[in-house]
Structures are given as C-alpha cells and as structure tokens.
C-alpha cells in the first residue's frame, strides 16, 4: 500500500509499505529518500507520536494515509561545571552572649552612686544609649562619626 509523509518543508513524499511494517522500517525508508537519520525523526499520525516497535496496523494507518514528519529536539541546557574554590569556606562569626555585659559600662562608687564609664553620644540621630568608643586620644561615635579629641597637656594652640 502507499502512504504519504509530509516533511518539515511542506514537501510530501510517497512510500510503498505494508500494514505489517514497523515504524522503524518506515523511518528507514524515509532515511533512504530524505537522508534524515531515524533517531532524529518523529512521525505523527492523528495527533499521536508513533512509537518505533509498533506496526502501522497498530495505529490503524491505511492506504493513502498521511504521516507528519518532525525532527526530534534535544532539550536541556549545557551542563555546568562544578565550581572549585581556591580558598576554604570562611567560618561564620558566632555571637558570644555575655550575661550582664551592660555592667562594664557603669561603676558604683564608694557612696553608692552609679557612674557612667563611657561617654554617651549627644547627637540626636544616634539616640539614647549609644556610647562612644574611647581611644587613647579621642572619643568616637561609630554610628554618626562624631569625634571628640583630647587636648594634650602642655600643647600649644
């Protein structure tokens, strides 16, 4: 019997087949005529893709039926190489919780009066409770950048 195969370009080719022929045989005949390897061919009939091991009779393909030939798309993206790091991973800093740590900012003098050891930043943007870092020659606020430099004794102005 004779069947038609419509290719991607719209060209229709005729094939002489038997209803007992497998889809593999049909693909081999298409390769002979068109030069397309069977592993890249996909044959569609009545909206279904034809599987290689089955026969034309399994799909009820009769004489003068038209099969549609489309090419197989090899999907997926290129495999990505695993990154190799030159340096070992940096260990994350673990916060140490110290109980009653706030006590280091205050001192109780002999009369029982509480005295602040660190200078508090007077800037309005910092808010209450922001202490200034005390360096050997200055007080510095890390939040707003305000700096008070100590006046050295005997220094000329």
UniProtKB/Swiss-Prot annotation:
One of its GO terms (molecular function) is zinc ion binding. SMART domains: Ribosomal_S27, UBQ. There is a cross-link at residue 76 (Glycyl lysine isopeptide (Gly-Lys) (interchain with K-? in acceptor proteins)). It holds the Pfam family Ribosomal_S27. Residues 1-76 form the Ubiquitin-like domain. Keywords: Cytoplasm, Isopeptide bond, Metal-binding, Nucleus, Ribonucleoprotein, Ribosomal protein, Zinc, Zinc-finger. GO terms for biological process: translation; ubiquitin-dependent protein catabolic process. The keyword Membrane does not apply. One of its GO terms (cellular component) is cytosolic small ribosomal subunit. A zinc finger (C4-type) spans 121-144. In the N-terminal section; belongs to the ubiquitin family. In the C-terminal section; belongs to the eukaryotic ribosomal protein eS31 family. Ubiquitin is encoded by 16 different genes. Ubiquitin is generally synthesized as a polyubiquitin precursor with tandem head to tail repeats. Often, there are one to three additional amino acids after the last repeat, removed in the mature protein. Alternatively, ubiquitin extension protein is synthesized as a single copy of ubiquitin fused to a ribosomal protein (either eL40 or eS31) or to a ubiquitin-related protein (either RUB1 or RUB2). Following translation, extension protein is cleaved from ubiquitin. This is Ubiquitin-ribosomal protein eS31y fusion protein. It comes from Arabidopsis thaliana. The lineage of its organism: Eukaryota, Viridiplantae, Streptophyta, Embryophyta, Tracheophyta. The gene is RPS27AB.
